[in-house]
A protein has these predicted regions:
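Short beta-strand segments at enzyme active-site cores
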Residues: 13-15, 48-61, 112-117, 191-194, ...
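Acidic, metal-binding active-site segment of PIN/NYN-like and related structure-specific nucleases
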Residues: 230-248
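Ligand-binding beta-strand-loop-alpha-helix segment within the catalytic cores
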Residues: 69-191
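Short acidic, glycine/serine/threonine-rich loops at helix termini
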Residues: 24-26, 60-65, 125-131, 203-205, ...
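A glycine- and small-aliphatic-rich helix-loop capping segment at beta-alpha/alpha-beta transitions
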Residues: 28-33, 65-76, 129-138, 205-213, ...
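Polyanion-binding loop/helix "lid" in catalytic or ligand-binding cores
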Residues: 30-38, 80-99, 103-104, 168-185, ...
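N-terminal glycine-/serine-/threonine-rich phosphate-binding loop
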Residues: 3-52, 61-71, 183-188
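Glycine-rich beta-alpha junction loops
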Residues: 117-124, 196-199, 239-241
Length: 299
């Protein structure tokens, strides 16, 4: 019967957005406890769970702390973006796995929850590297911005607020640790992987070189769900469902969509570039690999 149970279990990939994690260390601890209850409900209902998460506020906080450290200690080398990303995976993963483990134990479920530090390969010639768009870190003065530009980094000005660093958001190619993630998932474990989109790396012979970039967390959630042949991808966000004419007086709920309908609305530019569009693209990419699957985009 054990094998039957294993086959019966529906595999779900859940992607957690900022609102599921909070913006500061204390906010995160509280937010994660609420999120853990929802995740535990899925485990209790018999789903095999793989979790991925955003790390926008966390990676910015770490990047800012490392940059400030450099100001105080001149000899200190600032941490590159890929190292900040690795730190955020550990820190967010630690909070999620402990909260979820405790929540499961309180329900009498003994299940290992583990975080897999995940790297994702990207193409060094990805056009995103020539046109960085992802804003990270704190506001800077003009002097600081000029220093960043001299270092070869990209900076944009937000009128009246200051300057901010922007990095590339290349497309994910391969999840390096996918076999480890798959083995844990197949063994019925709860896995946290590809946090913050994964650490972007470029293959150089046998070595993996960290890239100064971040991967869109929604696109990696779609890739992960496809690679694991998940039955469902759940993308948690700040709105209850997908809308057309979002934010206008003609706003309309889209409670269910086929891939072709989603593609048609996409052509009409119905989905916001920075928020809903990457989620729709992730859904389409996953469903192209797993046509029997389904995607839930909700709060």
């Amino acid at each position: 019967s054990f094998m039957n149970n294993k086959i019966m279990k529906k595999r779900v990939v859940v992607s957690l957005g900022h609102q599921a994690l909070g913006y500061t260390t204390l906010e995160q601890r509280d937010a994660v406890q609420i999120t853990a209850r929802a995740l535990a409900d899925l485990v209790e209902a018999g789903y095999q769970l793989t979790i991925t998460h955003s790390n926008g506020p966390q990676v910015s906080m770490i990047h800012k702390a490392m940059t400030e450290l450099r100001r105080v200690y001149i000899d200190y080398t600032p941490a590159p973006m890929c190292v900040c990303s690795a730190m955020s995976q550990g820190y967010v993963g630690y909070d999620i796995q402990n909260s979820l483990r405790a929540e499961l134990l309180s329900r009498g479920i003994s299940r290992t929850v583990s975080t897999v530090l995940t790297q994702v390969t990207v193409d060094p010639y990805d056009e995103a590297f020539y046109e960085p768009t992802k804003i990270i870190g704190r506001y800077m003065s003009r002097d600081d911005a000029e220093t960043e530009i001299k270092k070869g980094n990209y900076v944009i000005e937000e009128p009246g607020k200051g300057f901010r660093r922007v990095v590339a958001a290349p497309k994910p190619i391969d999840i390096v640790e996918i076999e480890a993630i798959r083995l844990l998932a197949d063994a019925g474990q709860v896995v946290i992987a590809c946090g913050g989109g994964g650490i972007p790396v470029i293959e150089q012979k046998h070595a993996l070189q960290g890239a100064s970039a971040v991967i869109e967390k929604d696109s990696i959630a779609g890739k992960l769900a496809g690679d694991l042949k998940a039955d469902q991808l759940i993308i948690l966000t700040s709105v209850p469902c997908v809308y057309k004419n979002f934010g206008s007086d003609r706003q309309e709920e889209l409670r269910s969509l086929t891939v072709s309908e989603a593609m048609a609305y996409r052509e009409e530019r119905q989905f916001g570039e920075g928020n809903m569009l990457p989620k729709i693209d992730a859904a389409i990419a996953y469903l192209n690999v797993c046509p029997q699957g389904s995607v839930l985009i909700t709060s």
